[in-house]
Amino acid sequence: MLARNNSLVTEFILAGLTDHPEFQQPLFFLFLVVYIVTMVGNLGLIILFGLNSHLHTPMYYFLFNLSFIDLCYSSVFTPKMLMNFVSKKNIISYVGCMTQLFFFLFFVISECYMLTSMAYDRYVAICNPLLYKVTMSHQVCSMLTFAAYIMGLAGATAHTGCMLRLTFCSANIINHYLCDILPLLQLSCTSTYVNEVVVLIVVGINIMVPSCTILISYVFIVTSILHIKSTQGRSKAFSTCSSHVIALSLFFGSAAFMYIKYSSGSMEQGKVSSVFYTNVVPMLNPLIYSLRNKDVKVALRKALIKIQRRNIF
């Protein structure tokens, strides 16, 4: 528990998304539905990709890992977030908070680079189709995936390590629904200069490098699509490409906006914008990247038919 003045904080209180009592119950059911849809969608795709050998290709390999990341990082904070809507005081221990911070950052940063790998995969498939099998070999895909997780581990370790060196004295109310970097820095009673420099460097790298790489990849992809002679083929490619760009913009845009708003002191706007990359995007990813795909639809239809036949007999 929190002791008196000049003593160290051993637990935090998560303020949650809103302090308006009339919104608590509706928001609980809303985010519960979002979480269930996220879990079912991503877990379903993981099982589908694992059981269907014809989906063991580079594109679906990255989608498998994306679903795994979304499944994990939604589960890192959502249970605590839901508790905040139904309990008067949502308490998390110091150790629990640092653990949540580490795994949240690990999965979020890993997702940034997994999305980058997926954009590169689409670039090679559309712009250099004849070299696709050679360029996107199993070894290359494994290296890109491993690199994504390594970047996630490095970023999470840097931020959490710097956070552990701080001292938290009297203030223990985190103005957020999860343990995140900037809300925690505001509570420290010691200098946060080193942490702020690390945030500037690490967050800058993990947002700018993936977003610029993805942007360049999609510029080349759009250029190639414009050379497609078939109007139907061109419109279909643009439809797929635009949905991907919207999902990516939501993820990177809301993450960048949240850090900008928290840095400028607009905490409430920062919390609301964070909902998009923490809750909305993991729910939409299966629909945008997988369930609109013809091969996935066929595999899903076959799986549902098998389940129906088993139930009949």
Swiss-Prot record:
Give a GO cellular-component term: plasma membrane
Q: Which residues lie on this side of the membrane: Cytoplasmic?
A: 47-54, 121-139, 218-237, 292-313
Domain of life, per lineage: Eukaryota
Q: Which residues cross the membrane?
A: 26-46, 55-75, 100-120, 140-160, 198-217, 238-258, 271-291
The cross-references to SUPFAM superfamilies, in alphabetical order and at most eight, read: Family A G protein-coupled receptor-like
Q: Which positions form S-S bridges?
A: 97-189
Which molecular-function annotations from GO does this UniProt entry contain?
Answer: G protein-coupled receptor activity; odorant binding; olfactory receptor activity
Glycosylated residues in this chain: 5
Q: What is one process in the GO biological process aspect for this record?
A: sensory perception of smell
Question: Record keywords: Disulfide bond included?
Answer: yes
Residue ranges, Extracellular side: 1-25, 76-99, 161-197, 259-270
Places the protein is found: Cell membrane
What keywords sit in the KW lines?
A: Cell membrane, Disulfide bond, G-protein coupled receptor, Glycoprotein, Membrane, Olfaction, Receptor, Sensory transduction, Transducer, Transmembrane, Transmembrane helix
CDD domains recorded: 7tmA_OR8B-like (cd15405)
What is its membrane topology? Multi-pass membrane protein
- Function noted in UniProt: Odorant receptor.
Q: Which PANTHER family match?
A: OLFACTORY RECEPTOR (PTHR48018)
Query: Family per UniProt?
Result: Belongs to the G-protein coupled receptor 1 family.
Please give the name of this protein.
Answer: Olfactory receptor 8B3
